[in-house]
């Protein structure tokens, strides 16, 4: 009958509109999630960037401090300076769990971003507020290494909290894939900084350093490599300020993880984040699972 056909048509139209709305919501949720994860994996990129930047800068840095008059820059000092960031990595990784639990995942990552930025700036200009520029000495070397340790703290925090953040905010069906993006970002960060160092050096000559025994070395081409010795290594370390500043700013605009929000009793905020990512139907069920898990562990 005409009446039955009309009802069927209305029902079909309603189902079609509902389907379109659901598809739009899913697309919006995926885009929102991808934006969040892309910001978070910048922490992984900085992990790789900070640990690999020394590879291009170490010869210029070594030649620079070999010009010091108040101490001898031996192989010991060179090895310590090249690896001092690892001290910060140990500190950062040891503190990551405490900070993530007390400050939250988001604020801990903001702090890591600030550490990366301060380290990049201080490693580029370690003389700032301490010594006259361009005068290599033991105090300047110590200050430089302090800044590298600060960057290492950022690495230690990012290495633990970035995958934690992604794992807690991603839906279970794609969680493994999204967490793996962080691992890719670490390697990509190392690759990027190799090219950055290459382009910074450009047509300039890198210093050639030869061992003369007993932990001592000499520069074979100091005049030709003057730019790399005085300036090049500074630009290499300073280049990290770009991704570090970007990370520190953008991470302020992503949400805290639903798990942490549930841990501190902010269920409404947790439900809002879950709804944006998973939709209305799944959000309440996921929140209930999170709360049950949190309750069991506490």
PLM region spans:
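Short, Lys/Arg-enriched N-terminal segments with co-localized hydrophobic residues
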Residues: 1-21
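Transmembrane-helix signature of 12-pass secondary carriers
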Residues: 18-298
